[in-house]
Amino acid sequence: MPWSQKAFAESINEDMYIFLKAVEDNNIVGYISLYKSFDEGDVVNLAVKEEYRRRGIATKLLESLIEWCKENGIGRLLLDVRESNNQAISLYSKKGFERLYIRKDFYDKPKEDGVVMQLKLANDELMESITTI
């Protein structure tokens, strides 16, 4: 769910958050944010202004974030998405994300289940060595 303006402002200056933006005609038309923790990252938000949707902006933002993660040692990405958000689930699936499990009643307004998805960026052998250290 989109963050409040206060939460967004507080996180933008924190080192553990990464923000990438899409700009058109000097206006921010979309952004994606990541919370990084060691070798993992949580995709916290992906948003595109309604009038700019269906132009591939979300895809480009997600691809750019995945590339940034690969270059910066992030081995796995996680995210939550509303179960009814078929467009987002389709985008994430096309980029290699897999469903892990359902979080019952995760979202409010309206109350809805969340789908937890992951994308492994490091191979399983590397991830296993990281988790067993």
Residue ranges and their predicted role:
Residues 54-71, 86-94:
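Conserved acetyl-CoA-binding loop-helix of GNAT-fold acetyltransferases
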Residues 92, 97, 117:
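Conserved active-site tyrosine of GNAT-family acetyltransferases
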Residues 14, 88, 111-112:
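Short Asp/Glu-rich motifs
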Residues 6, 80, 98-115:
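Conserved catalytic-core motifs of GNAT/GCN5-like acyltransferases
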